[in-house]
A protein has these predicted regions:
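Auxiliary tRNA-acceptor-end handling modules of aminoacyl-tRNA synthetases
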Residues: 1-261
Length: 261
C-alpha cells in the first residue's frame, strides 16, 4: 500500500506536535524490575512543520525552542535566528498538486515505514535500549487515519537489540539481557497546534509543577537568561465569562479536559 499526505497551502509553516508511543510492547524488551517498556509508554516527542523548498520539494523541519528571541527590533534577534537554522529532517518530492494548485501531495510511505527520530524512538532512548535500525523486511505500516486536527499512524517495527552490559538501570535503559529481535507496535500522533500559542505560566519552585526551560535573549539586555515555564493544560475561560473570571468567580473553561476510558 501507498500512503500520501495532501498538505493544503494553509498548513505550510504551521507547527505540528508529534507524540510517539509504544502501543504494544515487545516480549523480552524489559530487564527485570524495569519501569519502562510497556504499552502506552512515550518514546519520543517533536514539533515539526512542512515548508516548500526548491525544485518541487517539500521539507519537514524539526523545530527546537531551546533558544528564543521574539523582539524583531532587538539587535540580538537577527543573531539568534542566524545561529538557529532549524534542521531539515526529511525531504519529499511533490507527487501532485491540490485542487487549487496551491496544496501539495507527497508520498510518505517509506518515511513512516522506515527509521527516523521524528516518528519513532528518540536517539537517546533508542541508544539506551540498544536498538539498531529498523529491519524493513520485518516491519510494516498497520494504518494511517486522518481526523480534523490530527493524524494517527500505526506501525509494526522490528529492531535488532545488542547484548546488555553487566549492569543496567531501571528507568528506560537496559532492556532485556540478551540480543535478538524486538518487534513492537508503535503509534504516532500528529496534532495541529493552534495559531495563537497559549499564555505561558512561569515556573515558581514553591508550586509543584513540572517545567521546561529555554534560553531567552530578550529578557536581559545585558546578557541572556534561562526561563522556566510550567507544563499545564490550556484551561481558559470563555470570552463571555472573562469579566467574571477576573472578579474571581467560578466559571466553566472554554475547552474542558476530557478523559476517555
Amino acid at each position: 500500500d501507498k500512503y500520501y499526505f495532501e498538505i493544503p497551502e494553509s498548513l505550510f509553516g504551521r507547527e505540528i506536535l508529534v507524540v510517539n508511543r509504544i502501543s504494544k510492547a515487545a516480549a523480552g524488551m524489559r530487564a527485570a524490575g524495569s519501569f519502562f517498556g510497556y504499552g502506552g509508554d512515550q518514546i519520543g516527542q517533536n514539533v515539526i512543520r512542512f515548508e516548500k523548498g526548491p525544485n518541487d520539494k517539500i521539507f519537514l523541519r524539526n523545530i527546537s525552542f531551546a533558544e528564543y528571541s521574539k523582539d524583531s527590533t532587538s539587535p540580538m534577534f537577527t543573531a539568534v535566528n542566524n545561529s538557529n537554522i532549524q534542521p531539515i529532517a526529511a525531504s519529499f518530492d511533490i507527487k501532485a498538486f491540490g485542487k487549487d494548485s496551491s496544496g501539495a501531495v507527497i508520498d510518505i510511505t517509506d518515511y513512516i515505514a522506515g527509521d527516523n527520530d521524528v516518528l519513532n524512538f528518540n536517539g537517546g532512548l533508542k541508544s539506551s535500549l540498544r536498538l539498531s535500525s529498523v529491519q524493513s523486511d520485518k516491519s510494516y505500516v498497520v494504518g494511517v487515519n486522518s481526523y480534523p486536527i490530527n493524524i494517527e499512524i500505526k506501525t509494526v517495527k522490528t529492531y535488532a537489540q545488542g547484548a546488555a552490559p553487566a549492569t543496567t538501570g531501571n528507568f528506560g535503559g537496559g532492556g532485556s539481557r540478551g540480543g535478538g529481535n524486538l518487534t513492537m507496535e508503535l503509534n504516532s500522533s500528529l496534532v495541529l497546534l493552534p495559531k495563537e500559542p497559549m499564555q505561558a505560566r512561569y515556573y515558581d519552585p514553591r508550586v509543584g509543577y513540572f517545567s521546561v526551560r529555554y534560553t531567552d535573549f530578550d529578557a536581559n539586555p545585558q546578557g541572556v537568561k534561562n526561563i522556566s515555564v510550567v507544563k499545564r493544560w490550556r484551561l481558559e475561560p470563555k470570552p463571555e465569562d472573562m469579566e467574571k473570571y477576573k472578579r474571581g468567580e467560578l466559571v466553566e473553561p472554554q475547552k474542558p479536559i476530557i478523559f476517555y476510558i
